[in-house]
Amino acid sequence: MSCQQNQQQCQPPPKCIPKCPPKCLTPRCPPKCPPKCPPVSSCCSVSSGGCCGSSSGGSCGSSSGGCCSSGGGGCCLSHHRRRRSHCHRPQSSGCCSQPSGGSSCCGGGSGQHSGGCC
């Protein structure tokens, strides 16, 4: 009898049943992340479209003033008389002269109202 009692004492205790995890407070579908801001060094100002000039290039023709031209730094400057916006290279007179778009104005140097990246 003593051996049987010892064997019962040596048996491991029954495993505890885990409790149900608390319900998540967050919704099932998390909110969509906003698009990542591109680096400042490769962007144009918002007044000229606010698009970035990536090395892969871009496209032109959105209703908000367009995107950057290929090569980086070039903004699409929308004209009031024409319906479509036209892309300009950074070397042209109607766009940024630098890829950063921060130090130089375009369109004759008259500032943002000329459609440049200042």
From Swiss-Prot:
Residues 90-103 have a biased composition (Low complexity). GO terms for biological process: keratinization. InterPro entries: LCE (IPR028205). Residues 104-118 have a biased composition (Gly residues). GO terms for molecular function: identical protein binding. Skin-specific. Expression was readily detected in adult trunk skin, adult arm skin, fetal skin, penal skin, vulva, esophagus and tongue. Not expressed in the cervix, rectum, lung, colon, or placenta. Keywords: Keratinization. Residues 87-118 are annotated as: Disordered. It comes from the Eukaryota. Pfam families: LCE. The keyword Transferase does not apply. Induction: By UVB. The keyword Iron does not apply. Precursors of the cornified envelope of the stratum corneum. Belongs to the LCE cluster present on 1q21. Interacts with CYSRT1; the interaction is direct. Belongs to the LCE family. This is Late cornified envelope protein 1B. It comes from Homo sapiens (Human).
